[in-house]
Amino acid sequence: MATQNGSPTDNTAPALNVLVQYIKDFSFENPNAPRSLGAPQGQPDVNIQINVNARPLAPGEFEVELKIEGGAAVQGNTLFAFDLTYGGIFRLMNVPEQSLQPVVLIECPRLLFPFARQIVADAVRGGGFPPLMIDPVDFAALYQQRMMAEAQNLQTAGQA
């Protein structure tokens, strides 16, 4: 098979396709409204946790879930809280076995993140607050932390 310019196509090149993206679970709480919607009595303390989970669905297909949860409080009073699980189904082709886990846990959530970030920003704005713009996430560092924690757990389990 050849491309339009006559050069052969490379059917063995690694490929990543997003088949579908979706909100799997989402909640937004504004427990102190309308009192919390006035001028804040200090700088809000914003707390955000991000986690990634993945599972195989079929050969070469994976469901990846990006979980973002957090909220904001001032002087111990909750302004808002949110919990989002944003998922995607990805097809990976010609990815070497040793690269499969990093691609699934780094590249796939990297592609999901901008959409999940927008959902959170819109919900916070819809709750009466300025939109929360979550900083970009280093999913490679998150993956490395996960691998180190798993290695530590295996080492601890081996000593027991």
Curated annotation (Swiss-Prot):
GO terms for cellular component: cytoplasm. Belongs to the SecB family. It comes from the Bacteria. This is Protein-export protein SecB. The keyword Translocase does not apply. Keywords: Chaperone, Cytoplasm, Protein transport, Translocation, Transport. One of the proteins required for the normal export of preproteins out of the cell cytoplasm. It is a molecular chaperone that binds to a subset of precursor proteins, maintaining them in a translocation-competent state. It also specifically binds to its receptor SecA. The keyword Transmembrane helix does not apply. GO terms for molecular function: unfolded protein binding. Its main location: cytoplasm. Homotetramer, a dimer of dimers. One homotetramer interacts with 1 SecA dimer. It is found in: Cytoplasm. SUPFAM superfamilies: SecB-like (SSF54611). NCBIfam families: PRK05751.1-3, secB. PANTHER family: PROTEIN-EXPORT PROTEIN SECB (PTHR36918:SF1), PTHR36918. It comes from Azorhizobium caulinodans (strain ATCC 43989 / DSM 5975 / JCM 20966 / LMG 6465 / NBRC 14845 / NCIMB 13405 / ORS 571). GO terms for biological process: protein folding; protein tetramerization; protein transport. Gene3D superfamilies: SecB-like (3.10.420.10).
